[in-house]
Amino acid sequence: MSGNFKKKICLITGARKGIGLSIGQTLAQNGYRVIFSGRKLNDCKDTVNQLVTDGFQAVESPINLSNLSSLKEQTEMALSIWGTVDILINNGAVIEPITSLEKIELQDFEKAVRVNYLAPSLLISYCWNNLLKNRGKVINVLSGASI
């Protein structure tokens, strides 16, 4: 890619495995700068190292969606890597325990609400100014099991 093309920057949560990992790899291999985010440092280390070795731009920055009190700071750290974000992909979620509604425990329900609803909403708000300035996009990925 040449000229004045500005490589788009994508922050993706839940990028350790599955859909998030595949999306992140595909974006990096297609010229995006990708911030892979898992719950803790080194969750995405192997993927990022392989992409960088192959000549793509990828970094890791942990964002623990279940810890709302540190979410803003973790998001700011991720954004500081390349200074902004163009695409936010909210992919991280919890789906356990998978049980009938009458058997679910309060702490499990609270965690699901915190990780699957509150954290993605807060991430959008923390990235909003950058997304607005860059005419960015938000993609929310949900499974029926996380609802």
Task: Pin down the residues of each PLM region.
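Conserved glycine-rich cofactor-binding loop
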Residues: 16-17
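Conserved glycine-rich Rossmann-like NAD(P)H-binding loop of the short-chain dehydrogenase/reductase
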Residues: 30-46
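The beta1-alpha1 cofactor-binding region of Rossmann-like NAD(H)/NADP(H)-dependent oxidoreductases
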Residues: 62-74, 106
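Conserved NAD(P)H cofactor-binding loop of Rossmann-fold oxidoreductase domains
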Residues: 91-97
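Substrate-binding pocket helix/loop in short-chain dehydrogenase/reductase
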Residues: 99-101, 105-110
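A short, exposed helix-loop element centered on a Lys and neighboring polar residues
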Residues: 124-125
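Catalytic loop of short-chain dehydrogenase/reductase
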Residues: 137-147
